[in-house]
């Protein structure tokens, strides 16, 4: 930053169009301008949003609405230092990041581990430093010792954690409690090394300092592969960060997507190898640069000194040579290659190991062995503590049970890499041993070691060729002088430990390959096992339902395996066996509910409108059905919303047909009694008011008309929020086809895309589907009808439909078939409303001037009545208004909250009753309106207003004059309706969501118009930043009731 302008490469930011939010350092702006960046005045036009304040609403708008990258100013400065545009990942200023606000001091960790930890913390919003001062919030230290540790203990403001706290936080995507990661809680296992400790005390004390620097003191730090490098060399981290982001989520769906990223990481591996010194692969570099790490939780510090002391001087020259030629850029490339392993700790082992084997099959011993130690501490203790063949094999078998026989061809391409790695390690050992020939240890150890190599390789199916160079390596040493045996014993112990580490690594790689094949076979067999999985899921979830529903499930489920095994296509056969009425009996279309006796449950408690329930009864009776006030044995149908009730259990036990009001609506439309065939036709499997999807915000794409309405209702019944739009806050997108803009955006934003069957299964009791959005049955979009319920979930409900509804002869005789009409009679019978519309209106008897001509609208009347009024209006010389804004008179019989009424109240001169028009027609002239003003005492008491006073206020000044409104898109009534009401009242509706800065600017400057925010329950996720800033957001009643009463009520309708 001291010389910003000259340092900026020419046209570095030529493609950058930036929009700055908040106060940005002027030097950063100068860097951007020097690199030919362009500043835009509106965030939607920008390619990058630059801000230090991640909670600013403008930042949220850019991210949610325009999907723009938001970066901190440090992205600019580091891009200049690197001479290239850095990827935007890792530079987010948002406060939702795991380590936001954290300042960590790193102590007593190796340089590579420090780089990895530094990258993890800064990538997730924190900052790191090497000095312990007042700014520090955390001290990351592997062991409870050292000067920084002693000082941090005395400060309550500094939390002390081990490095694995960072890894676990990143793995679980949340900041975990630091108390469980204090270094004092580390437990060391010393049983395996007690004998060697006494022999090497003196040498351990000499190497203690170097041990702290070169070893990894915490097992979790060495567990994952190398993380992205320290912040400075970030120019080559783009692909690594992409993999990092993709693998940072532990959800099953994103684990599967990680497989797609893995092949893209192969080229960086080759690049890294090309840039290494000749003759040295990644494994060789790590062996020379660092002694293989020993986890702090397994071995005590003195034991680690023993393990690293032999041969240490031999490695110094090699290490300095390698470190001199191995640049940070090379390490960065290697870390990019290994990035797939970041945060794999808590994942299923098969997925994690597949990623590891695909992305970096030839990783260093340091990384691979350490990762194995994370999962198998006992095995590590045995491997490091003693050079025995049988115990090692036993431990491997214990922790890695035999896998099923798999195809061998994917493993073949890995074996040459393993052999190459072995040969490189053997060459290194030869280089170390030849300058100082030490005597051979006692002969009984070497045959034992050979046996170990052979047994392990046979067990793991690895080629035994690399064994021979090792045998040749040891034979010349057998002729050395006896006085060097003690020193050689230590050196040989070190070699054996490295060999054991090597074979442990090979075992890990082989296990990864086997697990990869297992996962692939599971995916291939998934479709064949779908029905069996569904049965098991149904049995598991039966335990979570209520007692009544549980009893039902136990009655239905025992028959499922037999039916599914005996009937391969159950859905087709069931469809053939289900009946409404007997096909042999002719039922009149108008009486298609003949023989059906309904009892109604659940709905009376849920419906506030009792008139609607009475309407149902009237409609059922009009089509030949009967409604009983209680459930009796003569009932044939139970109309219910939920499976969790005693009435439902009784009805199912008596083989009654249990259906919903939605089914009734469907058969009324089709005029035919038919079995239920959609998920909405069946009662839901949870109690009324239950909300299994309460955490979901659902959007749909590809569905129109009735199908879209059905999905809205299904989402409502499941307790989910529904949005007609798609934003990053949505949790699920329900697709008809895998195409369209919403689908593409959902894939880009990693929003699960499922079919409609997913939601139907949840309604019918398969709550496991909530965690199975990635299952193939829910991601298949070529289904003929995605609303058809899963057969095994409705077996018991369909059982009653296997016999037809009985219709007695008396019932049929009581129904008179309507006489067939002649064609000319059919033509003459037309609805009166249509007849009125096509008739020519009589010419007006009087011609009035435009100023005196009433422009009238009608609301709250039947169409036939409206046509009669229009005829009289035309005779008198009046006209029907083209739109509300031009209307002078609104004719209504009562106060109604229709669009016409709520828009007209702000602009019309008079709201009158139909009596005014009738009286005008009698007198054949328009008379004074004062005696015919609409008065509705009931509505005025209900809404606590006076219609006459409201009209007077509207005439004085429009209610929303000089006011701006931002209305969220999911508002009900629709956005178009709300906009019409607001604009008629003098307000204006903003098309774009206003930023916090704009809101405050309008609030503080009295000369600017006020901005009012209107939203609804389903859109509250769009207003999170407003709530965080204490800005009021109101519901639709602020507008609807406001225009009716012509008042502004800022308190009654705001969200808390």
From Swiss-Prot:
Residues 577-1056 are annotated as: Interaction with TP53BP1. A motif (Nuclear localization signal) lies at residues 655-672. Its main location: nucleus. Residues 188-276, 393-412, 419-486 are annotated as: Disordered. Disruption phenotype: Mice are developmentally retarded, disorganized, and embryonic lethal by 9.5 dpc. Mutant cells appear to replicate DNA but show reduced levels of mitosis and widespread cell death by 8.5 dpc. DNA damage appears to precede nuclear condensation at 7 dpc. Reduced levels of histone H3 methylated at 'Lys-4 in developing tissues. Residues 214-223, 396-412, 419-435, 445-486 have a biased composition (Low complexity). Expression detected in all tissues examined, including brain stem, cerebellum, cortex, heart, spleen, kidney, liver, thymus and lung. Residues 188-205 have a biased composition (Acidic residues). It is found in: Nucleus matrix; Chromosome. The modification Phosphoserine is found at residues 223, 230. Residues 94-183 are annotated as: Interaction with PAGR1. GO terms for cellular component: chromosome; histone methyltransferase complex; MLL3/4 complex; nuclear matrix; nucleoplasm; nucleus. Residues 8-93, 94-183, 588-681, 688-776, 853-934, 955-989 form the BRCT domain. It comes from the Eukaryota. Pfam families: BRCT, BRCT_2, PTCB-BRCT, RTT107_BRCT_5. The BRCT 1 and 2 domains mediate the interaction with PAGR1A. The BRCT 5 and 6 domains mediate the association with the MLL2/MLL3 complex. The BRCT 5 and 6 domains function as a single module and are necessary and sufficient for in vitro phospho-specific binding (substrates phosphorylated by the kinases ataxia telangiectasia-mutated (ATM), ataxia telangiectasia and RAD3-related (ATR) in response to gamma irradiation). In contrast, in vivo two pairs of BRCT domains (3-6) bind to phosphorylated TP53BP1 much more efficiently. Involved in DNA damage response and in transcriptional regulation through histone methyltransferase (HMT) complexes such as the MLL2/MLL3 complex. Plays a role in early development. In DNA damage response is required for cell survival after ionizing radiation. In vitro shown to be involved in the homologous recombination mechanism for the repair of double-strand breaks (DSBs). Its localization to DNA damage foci requires Rnf8 and Ube2n. Interacts with the C-terminal transactivation domain of PAX2. Forms a constitutive complex with PAGR1 independently of the MLL2/MLL3 complex. Interacts with TP53BP1 (when phosphorylated at the N-terminus by ATM). Interacts with HLTF. Component of the KMT2 family MLL2/MLL3 complex (also named ASCOM complex), at least composed of the HMTs KMT2D and/or KMT2C, the common subunits ASH2L, RBBP5, WDR5 and DPY30, and the complex type-specific subunits PAXIP1/PTIP, PAGR1, NCOA6 and KDM6A; required for the association of PAGR1 with the MLL2/MLL3 complex. This is PAX-interacting protein 1. It comes from Mus musculus. The lineage of its organism: Eukaryota, Metazoa, Chordata, Craniata, Vertebrata.
């Amino acid at each position: 930053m001291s010389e910003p302008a000259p340092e900026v490469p020419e046209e570095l930011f030529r493609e950058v169009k930036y929009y700055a939010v908040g106060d940005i350092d002027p030097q950063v702006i100068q860097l951007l301008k020097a690199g030919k960046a362009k500043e835009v005045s509106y965030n939607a036009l920008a390619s990058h949003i630059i801000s230090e304040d991640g909670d600013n609403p403008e930042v949220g708008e850019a991210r949610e609405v325009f999907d723009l990258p938001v970066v901190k100013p440090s992205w600019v400065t580091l891009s200049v230092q690197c001479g290239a545009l850095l990827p935007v990942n890792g530079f987010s200023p948002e406060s939702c990041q795991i380590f936001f606000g954290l300042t960590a001091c790193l102590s007593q960790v190796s340089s590579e581990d420090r780089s990895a930890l530094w990258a993890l913390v800064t990538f997730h919003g924190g900052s790191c430093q090497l000095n312990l001062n007042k700014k520090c919030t955390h001290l990351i230290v592997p062991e409870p010792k050292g000067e920084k540790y002693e000082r941090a203990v005395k400060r309550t403001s500094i939390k002390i954690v081990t490095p694995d706290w960072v890894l676990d936080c990143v793995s679980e995507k949340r900041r975990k409690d630091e108390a469980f990661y204090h270094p004092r809680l580390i437990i060391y296992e010393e049983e395996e090394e007690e004998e060697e400790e006494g022999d090497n005390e003196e040498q351990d004390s000499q190497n203690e300092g170097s041990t702290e620097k070169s070893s990894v003191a915490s097992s979790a730090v060495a567990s994952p592969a190398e993380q992205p490098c320290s912040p400075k060399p970030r120019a080559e981290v783009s692909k690594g960060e992409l993999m990092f982001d993709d693998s940072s989520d532990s959800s099953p769906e994103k684990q599967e997507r990680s497989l797609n990223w893995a092949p893209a990481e192969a080229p960086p591996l080759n690049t890294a190898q090309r840039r290494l010194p000749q003759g040295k692969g990644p494994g060789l570099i790590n062996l020379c640069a660092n002694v293989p790490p020993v986890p702090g939780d397994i071995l005590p510090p003195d034991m680690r000194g023993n393990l690293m002391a032999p041969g240490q001087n031999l490695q110094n020259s090699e290490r300095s040579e390698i470190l001199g030629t191995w640049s940070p850029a090379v390490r960065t490339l290697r870390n990019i290659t290994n990035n797939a392993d970041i945060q794999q700790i808590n994942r299923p082992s098969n997925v994690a190991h597949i990623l590891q084997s695909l992305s970096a099959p030839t990783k260093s011993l340091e990384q691979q062995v350490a990762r194995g130690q994370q999962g198998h501490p006992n095995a590590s203790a045995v491997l490091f503590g003693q050079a025995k063949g049988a115990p090692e094999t036993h431990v491997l078998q214990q922790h890695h049970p035999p896998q099923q026989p798999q195809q061998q061809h994917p493993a073949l391409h890995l074996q040459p890499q393993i052999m190459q790695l072995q040969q490189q390690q053997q060459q290194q050992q030869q280089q170390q041993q030849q300058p100082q020939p030490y005597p051979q240890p006692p002969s009984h150890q070497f045959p034992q070691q050979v046996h170990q190599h052979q047994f392990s390789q046979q067990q793991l199916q690895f080629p035994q060729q690399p064994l021979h160079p090792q045998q040749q390596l040891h034979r010349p040493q057998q002729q050395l002088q006896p006085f060097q045996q003690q020193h050689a014993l230590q050196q040989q112990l070190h070699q054996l430990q490295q060999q054991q580490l090597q074979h442990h690594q090979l075992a890990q790689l082989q296990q990864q390959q086997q697990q990869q094949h297992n996962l692939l076979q599971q995916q291939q067999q998934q479709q064949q096992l779908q029905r069996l999985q569904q049965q098991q899921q149904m049995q598991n979830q039966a335990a979570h339902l209520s007692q009544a529903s549980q009893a039902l499930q136990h009655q239905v489920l025992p028959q499922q395996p037999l039916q599914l095994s005996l009937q391969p296509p159950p859905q087709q056969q069931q469809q053939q066996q289900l009946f409404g009425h007997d096909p042999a009996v002719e039922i009149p279309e108008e009486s298609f509910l003949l023989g059906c006796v309904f009892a109604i449950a659940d709905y009376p408690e849920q419906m506030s409108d009792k008139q609607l329930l009475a309407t149902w009864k009237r409609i059922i009776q009009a089509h030949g059905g009967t409604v009983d006030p209680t459930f009796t044995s003569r009932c044939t149908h139970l109309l219910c919303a939920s499976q969790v009730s005693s009435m439902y259990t009784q009805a199912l036990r008596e083989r009654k047909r249990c259906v919903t009001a939605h089914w009734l609506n469907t058969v009324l439309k089709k005029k035919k009694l038919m079995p239920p065939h959609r998920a909405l036709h069946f009662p839901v499997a949870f109690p009324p008011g239950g909300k299994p999807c309460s955490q979901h915000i659902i959007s749909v794409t590809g569905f129109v008309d009735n199908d879209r309405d059905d999905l809205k209702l299904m989402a409502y019944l499941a307790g989910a929020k529904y949005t007609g739009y798609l934003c990053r806050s949505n949790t699920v997108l329900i697709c008809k086809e895998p195409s369209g803009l919403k689908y593409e955006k959902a894939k880009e934003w990693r929003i699960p895309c499922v079919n409609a069957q997913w939601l139907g299964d949840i309604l019918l009791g398969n709550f496991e589907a909530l965690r199975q959005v990635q299952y193939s049955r829910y991601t298949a979009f070529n289904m003929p009808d995605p609303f058809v319920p899963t057969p095994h979930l409705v077996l018991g409900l369909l059982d009653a439909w296997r016999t037809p509804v009985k219709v007695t002869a008396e019932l049929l005789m009581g129904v008179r078939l309507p006489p067939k009409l002649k064609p000319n009679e059919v033509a003459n019978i037309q609805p009166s409303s249509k007849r009125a519309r096509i008739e020519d209106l009589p010419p007006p008897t009087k011609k009035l001037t435009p100023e005196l001509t009433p422009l009238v609208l009608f609301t709250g009347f039947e169409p036939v009545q409206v046509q009669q009024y229009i005829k009289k209006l035309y005779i008198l010389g009046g006209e029907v208004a083209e739109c509300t804004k031009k209307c002078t008179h609104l004719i209504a019989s009562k106060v109604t909250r229709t669009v016409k009424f709520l828009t007209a109240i702000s602009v019309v001169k008079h709201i009158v009753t139909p009596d005014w028009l009738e009286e005008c027609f009698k007198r054949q002239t328009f008379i004074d309106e004062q005696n015919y003003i609409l008065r509705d005492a009931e509505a005025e008491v209900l809404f606590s207003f006076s219609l006459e006073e409201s009209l007077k206020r509207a005439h004085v000044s429009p209610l929303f004059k000089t006011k701006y409104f931002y209305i969220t898109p999911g508002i009900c009534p629709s956005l178009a309706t709300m906009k019409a009401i607001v604009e008629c009242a003098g307000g204006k509706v903003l098309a774009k969501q206003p930023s916090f800065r704009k809101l405050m600017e309008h609030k503080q400057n009295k000369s600017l118009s006020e901005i009012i925010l209107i939203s609804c329950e389903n859109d509250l996720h769009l207003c999170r930043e407003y709530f965080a800033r204490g800005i009021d957001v109101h519901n639709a009643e602020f507008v609807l009731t406001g225009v009716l009463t012509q008042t502004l009520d800022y308190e009654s309708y705001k969200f808390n």
